[in-house]
Amino acid sequence: DQGYSRYFGDAKPGNKSANDWLGNRRMLEAFIQHESTEAARADSPPVLVFEAVGEAGRIKGQVIFHGVAVITRAELIVQREDGGRRRTFPNYVFELAPLDLSHENESLDWNWINARRNPSVAIREVLQLAPSAWKLWVESGSVGSLRRNVVTRGVVTEAMQRPNPGSIEAAILQD
C-alpha cells in the first residue's frame, strides 16, 4: 500500500526453469510491454492485484481487490520453498506499482476489463474506460506520482503502551 507490491512468480521446486512456467512467461511479456512504447503500453495488460484472506476458518476462496498495477521490475531469483524439504528453485519476483484510483473513488470500472477482451473494440475506445492514472501512465510511461499510497493509522493496544513491570517508567506512572 505504499506505492509498490511484490509478486513472486508461479515456479515451484522441480526440474523446470523459471521461464517454463506459463504465469512467469505471461508476466515477462507484460513487463516488456509495460516498459515499451506508448502504443505497446496502450495494448498492455493491467495487473489486477488481489490479496487472499482467511474468513470464517476458510483459508482459500476469499480475496480483497487492491487495484490495478504496472510491472516496474522483473528479477530472476533463487527461492526456497516453505515448510517440508525447503528446496531451492529459480523463480521471478515482479515489482508492481499499484496505480492511484482516487479519481475513481477507489473502484474499478470492470467494463474496461471486459472491453479489453473484445477484439472488435479499438484500443483507443478501451482506453476511454480505463482509470485516469492508467491513461496518464500509457501517455507518459512513468508511474512516478501515479502510484497508490494508502495512509494507515497504527493502533497500538493499551498493553503494548504500558511499560515493563518494575521499570523506571512503571514507577513514574505509579507516582
Which role fits each region the language model picked out?
Residues 16, 134, 166-168:
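A generic alpha-helix propensity feature with a strong bias for hydrophobic helices
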Residues 1-62:
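Acidic, glycine-rich low-complexity segments with interspersed aromatic residues
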Residues 52-54, 71-74:
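An acidic- and aromatic-residue-enriched active-site/binding cleft used to recognize and process polar
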Residues 61-66, 72-162:
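Contiguous surface segments at macromolecular interaction interfaces
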Residues 29-33, 124, 169, 173:
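Generic detector of well-ordered alpha-helical segments enriched in charged/polar residues
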Residues 159-175:
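Acidic-basic catalytic patches of nuclease active cores, encompassing PD-(D/E)XK
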Residues 45-46, 67, 73, 175:
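Secondary-structure-rich domain cores
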